[in-house]
Amino acid sequence: MSHLDNGFRSLTLQRFPATDDVNPLQAWEAADEYLLQQLDDTEIRGPVLILNDAFGALSCALAEHKPYSIGDSYISELATRENLRLNGIDESSVKFLDSTADYLQQPGVVLIKVPKTLALLEQQLRALRKVVTSDTRIIAGAKARDIHTSTLELFEKVLGPTTTTLAWKKARLINCTFNEPPLADAPQTVSWKLEGTDWTIHNHANVFSRTGLDIGARFFMQHLPENLEGEIVDLGCGNGVIGLTLLDKNPQAKVVFVDESPMAVASSRMNVETNMPEALDRCEFMINNALSGVEPFRFNAVLCNPPFHQQHALTDNVAWEMFHHARRCLKINGELYIVANRHLDYFHKLKKIFGNCTTIATNNKFVVLKTVKLGRRR
């Protein structure tokens, strides 16, 4: 846990999933402080929109103003809810909208934590363009190193005149005034042909490796199991290419596509509808934090390309949680397959959780691992 003192309220905040005490990661950053410094209670008039509030620092601080929190992370929503409870703030103080929803009209203040991907930022700025006015105060913040010329140019192109502040604690802010500059329409998704198939893959803005198949997934697809039956999971499904391949290779199986990103789940659904519509009755689509709330002993197999970062931080906490959830939800003798960068040493982590692990394939960068849920371990 960490403490954030600001002009609105003193907060105790924690990350979600929680980090260990040996290598703790903070649930807020200097950009959050800097953004809050720019606001004074007397000048907040009209609805407050907060975009990409990773762990709820901004939403908790401004809870009295009933803000709307918008993002493409269900984990961020869970983190915000947890931090509201931790600080004794009514959860209903913050309204949550996912990245595919329409934004509230005529907001008084918009606070943006600049996301990692320029594509997501553009999608969000285009959505804001439909609802903000020239009186809306628009402020964005990030680490100074993450604000580039291309970032400022995007604000200028979509919304209007843009300036940036001096750096403070290695953070920088962007101030923007809406004047409705001319702007050509842009598609909601990008699409590309998946080599070796007849499939066209469609990706929403925040999907990993948006413009082509990432090399880890490419390697994983060469080693996916065949002839499985029952329910299997594409955990952290992204655009769903792994799940699509599983549907194709396992015609007797049902595939559950799971991701914490609403855009990822929407992309997966679109890709099944476009490329294998006849298999839709063998699919389930779920926005979730790994397999939280899913009943134990449900699945015959789980397949996963786990992330090793959360927001801008490198961490294996999300992967570790995925592995534990997979073990709980697998049937006895159910199998977990993962692909990962070799340097992450997931072999020993999986062996610690499951009691066994086998290397299926390896190259100079990636490894495909398999582990089995044995009945003797609880």
UniProtKB/Swiss-Prot annotation:
<keyword id="KW-0698">rRNA processing</keyword>
<dbReference type="InterPro" id="IPR029063">
    <property type="entry name" value="SAM-dependent_MTases_sf"/>
</dbReference>
<keyword id="KW-0808">Transferase</keyword>
<comment type="function">
    <text>Specifically methylates the guanine in position 1835 (m2G1835) of 23S rRNA.</text>
</comment>
<dbReference type="GO" id="GO:0052916">
    <property type="term" value="F:23S rRNA (guanine(1835)-N(2))-methyltransferase activity"/>
</dbReference>
<keyword id="KW-0963">Cytoplasm</keyword>
<comment type="similarity">
    <text>Belongs to the methyltransferase superfamily. RlmG family.</text>
</comment>
<dbReference type="Pfam" id="PF05175">
    <property type="entry name" value="MTS"/>
</dbReference>
<dbReference type="InterPro" id="IPR007848">
    <property type="entry name" value="Small_mtfrase_dom"/>
</dbReference>
<keyword id="KW-0949">S-adenosyl-L-methionine</keyword>
<dbReference type="GO" id="GO:0005737">
    <property type="term" value="C:cytoplasm"/>
</dbReference>
<dbReference type="InterPro" id="IPR046977">
    <property type="entry name" value="RsmC/RlmG"/>
</dbReference>
<dbReference type="GO" id="GO:0003676">
    <property type="term" value="F:nucleic acid binding"/>
</dbReference>
<dbReference type="InterPro" id="IPR002052">
    <property type="entry name" value="DNA_methylase_N6_adenine_CS"/>
</dbReference>
<protein>
    <recommendedName>
        <fullName>Ribosomal RNA large subunit methyltransferase G</fullName>
        <ecNumber>2.1.1.174</ecNumber>
    </recommendedName>
</protein>
<keyword id="KW-0489">Methyltransferase</keyword>
<dbReference type="InterPro" id="IPR017237">
    <property type="entry name" value="rRNA_m2G-MeTrfase_RlmG"/>
</dbReference>
